[in-house]
Amino acid sequence: MFDIKEQLKLLPDKPGVYLMKNKANEIIYVGKAISLKNRVRQYFQSSNNQHPKVRAMVTHINFFEYIVTDSELEALILECNLIKENRPKYNVLLRDDKTYPYIKVTMNETFPRVLKTRKVLKDKAKYFGPYTNISALNETLEVIHQMYPIRVCGKNIEKMIERQERPCLNYHIRKCIGPCTGMVNDETYQQMIHEIILFLGGKEDELIKKIEEKMKRAAEKMDFEGAAHYRDQRQALLDIIERQKVVSVNDIDQDIIAMAKGEQESCVQVFFVRGGKLVQREHYILTTREDEDEKEILSAFIKQFYGETNFIPKEVLVEREVEDQELMAQWLTNKRGNHVKVRAPLRGEKKSMIQLVKRNAALTMGQREETQRKSKEKTEGAMVVLQEALGLADAIHRVEAFDISNTQGMESVGSMVVFEGGKPKNKDYRRFKIKTIQGANDYGSIEEIIYRRYKRGVDETKAMIENTMTVQEGKFSLFPDLIMVDGGLGQVTSVKKGLAALGILIPVCGMVKDERHRTRGLVYEGKEIPIERPSHLLRFITQVQDEVHRFAITYHRSLRTKSILHSVLEDIPGIGEKRRKSLMKHFESIDKMKQATIEELIEVEGLNRKVAENMYHFFRKQ
């Protein structure tokens, strides 16, 4: 057993990272320290002077681990990586940071592409971002592809050249110079990529000089078409620069950072200044508490933001001093390769810019909170109205809805979708193959899936009571406040039969539609309850009906497709179960398989030339 008091005595007086864990062995906090011995002990001393968040966290600490590092800087880097990997509950976290897109230049390819991505990999590519404004990102990509005829396809260029494949339409309409033809000079292509990187790095002035030189050389050679192309490139860049605000007389790269706090999250606004011009601004949302220290929030943002991005400016301006400011500057200097300043200006032009950024952060935070308030009215408000409409004593938080799908009784499936607080909870959705009912019997099918779903829930609950299963392992143990079923009295009766067999009492209502297939009302306790039109409740019920139907029909279609694929492929010599799965995964449809060449078939995992030829000739005979 882990004895915290004894382990505290063994802590080394060295820099490192500590990981606080709860009873479920989950990492709930990651921190760094110049002295592990002193820092970790502070958590377990008198709580009188502790921050409320720290007091709350300490009550959940079951044990801790630590990693000794050679320096505090090394500890900072390790802390950043561990926070990103584990996303601990009590650390300040960038909300949905994985979803922010980047512009990626695929430097790991012979002929690089420029594309949008949501994953930052260690693959030698260059990444620019992250962008929270998708429109700005798409506009940037559009400008790049207008200016530079680089490839957009993900094909293997070497193989295309080797097979002498035809270039695509983009080559013929001059949107791509066609490296797949084998006639493109590598140096010419790399020069375009170099200029794109200058552009993405905010070096438009340097790029314009290069383009002007090329335009001049083309004119001297009487290459008027080339000169016109460079003129258009130059003008496109000038148009972009014209939209950029000059914020500094100094030709400097800066990121200016300020924040605004809300009740449960904070908004950090960043102005990106390149060469003295404001080229872009972005805002980022962090999950925080109302009593969270602003220094800690800004510090957490800087670690997470610059841990992801490739470009580090010469100067980072923040609205107030942050934790470990000198250490942050040292870390960023190492990442950039030359000196980086992190400072909180107190007066002058830089202070004015900070105040401007802070006003923008406050405006964004206010707009976000207003949007969330209206959203809450639609979602949680609909739950209150639903409770009142049904006359239920208890509040409705979790709703589970069911539907059946089949084609003339074949491939019958059931689906369950879940809503919590009026919002879909996709990870709790479940699908069921009908096992005991033959033919098109919706009532019997619903009774079966209800029994199976809640029988699993009962079994899991028993296992948890007996300590043979943890709460985290349970997939069916959470029961709803209300069950909804697509249909009327017959479907509701079937649900109740399934529940009665298990001795479970949960309110059940049916969702009925009119002759025009529009949501009409609810069936509850033998009566139909009309729903006001339009209303938040009607929108919610319609959303539930559409979602449960979509989920059921999608599953049904996928099973039918697999069944058809399976039966056709059975007739081809050399195609067994493993190869069938590979083909289904690769092509997804019979039509695509029929159109494939022998060479394309060989690319499927597990297929050799002989089997590929068998398939090719089999489909040609049909």
UniProtKB/Swiss-Prot annotation:
Occurrences of domain GIY-YIG (ranges): 13-92
**Where found, per UniProt?**
Cytoplasm
All copies of the UVR domain together span 205-240
- Which InterPro entries does this UniProt record tie to the protein? DisA/LigA_HHH (IPR041663), GIY-YIG_endonuc (IPR000305), GIY-YIG_endonuc_sf (IPR035901), GIY-YIG_UvrC_Cho (IPR047296), Hlx-hairpin-Hlx_DNA-bd_motif (IPR003583), RuvA_2-like (IPR010994), UVR_dom (IPR001943), UVR_dom_sf (IPR036876)
GO process annotations (BP)? nucleotide-excision repair; SOS response
- GO CC list: cytoplasm; excinuclease repair complex
UniProt KW keywords: Cytoplasm, DNA damage, DNA excision, DNA repair, Excision nuclease, SOS response
| Molecular-function GO terms, alphabetical | DNA binding; excinuclease ABC activity
Task: Please name the SUPFAM superfamilies in this protein's record.
Answer: C-terminal UvrC-binding domain of UvrB, GIY-YIG endonuclease, RuvA domain 2-like
The subunit structure is: Interacts with UvrB in an incision complex.
Q: Which family does it belong to?
A: Belongs to the UvrC family.
Q: Which PANTHER family match?
A: UVRABC SYSTEM PROTEIN C (PTHR30562:SF1), UVRC/OXIDOREDUCTASE (PTHR30562)
What exactly does this protein do? The UvrABC repair system catalyzes the recognition and processing of DNA lesions. UvrC both incises the 5' and 3' sides of the lesion. The N-terminal half is responsible for the 3' incision and the C-terminal half is responsible for the 5' incision.
Q: Tell me what this protein is called.
A: UvrABC system protein C
Which organism's genome codes for this protein?
Answer: Alkaliphilus metalliredigens (strain QYMF)
| Lineage, uppermost ranks | Bacteria, Bacillati, Bacillota, Clostridia, Peptostreptococcales
